[in-house]
C-alpha cells in the first residue's frame, strides 16, 4: 500500500518474509525537476528476501523514480534498512549513512557473520558450557543472520551526520541524532511541515531491540534518555517509522517502551538475585523468557539469539545502576546481585 502523507511525500508499507520483521516502509520525497529525489532506507537485500527487492522496484516504477536520480538516506546500519544500498549504488543512486553507525553495525554484525566473531558471542552468552548438540543447533540457527547478506555493508557511501540539512522539493530535511537502537541512528525531519522519518527509534507495535554487545556502552540508558528528548522535541510531529503506519503523539509509544524495559530489567534483577550464585547470560535470558523448557525449533533459536542482545543491554543497564555485577570468566559473562 502506498500513501501520500504530504504533497510529494510517499510511504509504501511492504510485507517481508523475514523472521521478526513482518513489514517495513519505503519512504520517498520527490525532488524538483533539477533535484534528485530521496528514499529513506531500502529494506532487506533481494538475495535474502526477494519480495523486498521486487516491491522496491515496483514502487519506484509506479511513482516514477529512477535509481540514477535518487539519494538514499539511511537511518541506521541494520540490514533491513540498508540491504539494497549496494544494488542501488551500482545503478547510480547515492547512499548517505552516518559513518559512526556503519562502524558499530560492522562490529555487531561481524559477531554473527564471521566465524571467529560468532564463537566469541557464543562463548560470551555461555553456550560453550552446554552439550555439543545444543551448540551446533544454535550455530545452524545463526546462519540465517549471514545467508543472503554477503557484502551487504560493502557499498560506496557519503557521510551524513546530525546537524546536516538538504532541500528536497518543498521540504527542508534536517538531520538529528536518535541514539539507542543503534549508536548512530539518525532521524530526518521537516520543521515547517512537522514530520520526521524516525527509523526504528520509536515504534508503536514493539519495543525496539537495544544491544550493548559491540562498541556502544550504556546503550539502554542512552536510549531511554533519547526517547524522552525525541518525544518532547517532536511532540506535535507526524512520525514515519521504519516499520508500521505513521503516527502522532509519540509520548504514548515512548512511555510504553520505557515501561517495557523497566519491567524487563526488574524481572532480570529478581532472577539474578534469587539465584544466589552467578548466572550465565544465556541462562538468565532463558529464565526471563521461560524458554528452553522443550526442544526448540530453528526459528525459535533464531529469536533466542536476538534475545541475547536485548538481555545483555538490560543487564549492563542494571550494572550501571549499581544493582548487578558482571564477571567475565574465560570469555563467558556471569552475573550476580550486589543488593
Model-identified regions with their sequence ranges:
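Hydrophobic "anchor" residues on beta-strands that sit immediately upstream
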Residues: 37, 72, 94, 196, ...
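Histidine-centered divalent metal-coordination motifs
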Residues: 71-81, 181, 185, 243, ...
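Metallo-beta-lactamase
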Residues: 42-46, 50, 148-155, 172-265
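Active-site HxH/HxHxD metal-binding segment of metal-dependent hydrolases
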Residues: 48, 54, 59-166
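C-terminal regulatory/interaction regions
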Residues: 271-339
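Divalent metal-coordination and catalytic microenvironments
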Residues: 8, 29, 41, 76, ...
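A short catalytic or substrate-binding loop motif that flags glycine-/basic-rich loops and adjacent residues
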Residues: 19-22, 158-160, 179-182
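Conserved beta-strand hairpin/beta-sheet module of binuclear metal-dependent hydrolase folds
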Residues: 2-63, 188-204
